[in-house]
Curated annotation (Swiss-Prot):
Binds the 23S rRNA. The gene is rpmE. The lineage of its organism: Bacteria, Pseudomonadati, Pseudomonadota, Betaproteobacteria, Rhodocyclales. Belongs to the bacterial ribosomal protein bL31 family. Type A subfamily. This is Large ribosomal subunit protein bL31. InterPro entries: Ribosomal_bL28/bL31-like_sf (IPR034704), Ribosomal_bL31 (IPR002150), Ribosomal_bL31_A (IPR027491), Ribosomal_bL31_sf (IPR042105). PANTHER family: 50S RIBOSOMAL PROTEIN L31, CHLOROPLASTIC, LARGE RIBOSOMAL SUBUNIT PROTEIN BL31C. Part of the 50S ribosomal subunit. Binds 1 zinc ion per subunit. One of its GO terms (biological process) is translation. The keyword Ligase does not apply. SUPFAM superfamilies: L28p-like. One of its GO terms (molecular function) is metal ion binding. It holds the Pfam family Ribosomal_L31. It comes from Azoarcus sp. (strain BH72).
Amino acid sequence: MKADIHPKYAEVNVTCSCGHVFTTRSTLGKPELHVEVCAACHPFYTGKQKIVDTAGRVERFRQKYGNVQRLG
């Protein structure tokens, strides 16, 4: 490897909005990183899936385009 061409690879403390803190290594250049979602609070990893209610959007679509018939 060539000398002095690679970025600095240092430890970074990652803080999630849920309060979970962990340390990793990165070329970020800052000692702290704040994220909104991590493995401790993401629904995929916790098994607590959230169902998004889109009934209002579907009803608006049906009201707007419900009377349209296919041509042909």
